């Protein structure tokens, strides 16, 4: 199973499969849905917030649609942040202990998760800019020109997320046969966007569609 039984609710609403959290039995305001299109045999995966729908993926493969839906749902619902450690990071910086604050972060992860002061597209990258910091992943900013306190906490939080989804990807790769690359899964979870393979102009991102 991609999700544990107590992690989610799964219901059929108006002909669509709806995945949502909490114990509510009424129609949720925020959810992920899979809609089977009878006209073209495609499955459409969408993220819905208060009736605003963002289409994340269109595919003819049922299993691929299910995997996309699960990753999007986990991105919305998972709470994996260690708030006590984030507080410790801030306290170190408040006392001028920048190196200790950084060690408090990197000691939690191996170096496949992060890079310091240079950008690696497949890692969470902390880049110094004077007394400010940028945090990037996949060529995109997670935080730009923020204070070190803010930058370090964002850096730590996203390292946690990347470590978590990397482990999840390895787990589902062992259980399932699917076509999504590691980069696609990681970017979908971290950035919330579907990623195509590179095309002739080098673009790999497909914009979400609002409905």
State the predicted function of each range.
Residues 1-24, 75-123, 128-130:
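Negatively charged, low-complexity tracts enriched in Asp/Glu with abundant Ser/Thr
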Residues 60-73, 150-161:
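A short, charged, amphipathic alpha-helix used as a generic interaction element across diverse proteins
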Residues 5-8, 72, 95, 108-111, ...:
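Surface-exposed polar/charged interaction patches
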Residues 1-6, 32, 56-65:
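Long alpha-helical, hydrophobic tracts
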Residues 55, 63-74, 79, 177:
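Long, terminal "pre-/pro-" and other extracytoplasmic accessory regions
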Residues 23-54, 72, 128-139:
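Short aromatic-glycine-(Arg/Gly/Cys) micro-motifs in beta-strand/loop hairpins
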Residues 50-63, 140-145:
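A short, exposed loop/beta-hairpin motif centered on an aromatic-Gly-Thr core
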Residues 125-211:
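A eukaryote-biased signal for long
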């Amino acid at each position: 199973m991609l999700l544990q039984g107590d992690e989610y609710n799964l219901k059929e609403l108006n002909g669509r499969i709806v995945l949502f959290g909490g114990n509510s039995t009424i129609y949720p305001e925020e959810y992920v849905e899979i809609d089977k299109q009878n006209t073209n045999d495609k499955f459409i995966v969408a993220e819905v917030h208060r009736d605003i729908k963002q289409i994340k993926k269109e595919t003819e493969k049922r299993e691929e649609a299910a995997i996309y839906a699960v990753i999007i749902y986990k991105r919305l619902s998972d709470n994996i942040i260690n708030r006590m450690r984030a507080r410790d990071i801030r306290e170190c910086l408040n006392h001028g202990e920048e190196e200790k604050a950084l060690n408090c972060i990197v000691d939690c992860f191996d170096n496949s998760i992060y890079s310091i002061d240079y950008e690696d597209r497949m890692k969470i990258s902390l880049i110094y800019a004077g007394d400010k910091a940028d945090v990037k992943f996949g060529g995109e900013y997670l935080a730009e020109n923020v204070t070190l306190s803010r930058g370090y906490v964002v850096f730590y939080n996203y390292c946690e997320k990347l470590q978590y989804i990397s482990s999840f990807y390895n787990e589902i790769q062992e259980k399932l046969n699917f076509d999504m690359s590691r980069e696609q899964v990681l970017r979908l979870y971290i950035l919330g966007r579907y990623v195509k393979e590179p095309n002739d102009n080098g673009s790999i991102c497909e914009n979400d569609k609002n409905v």
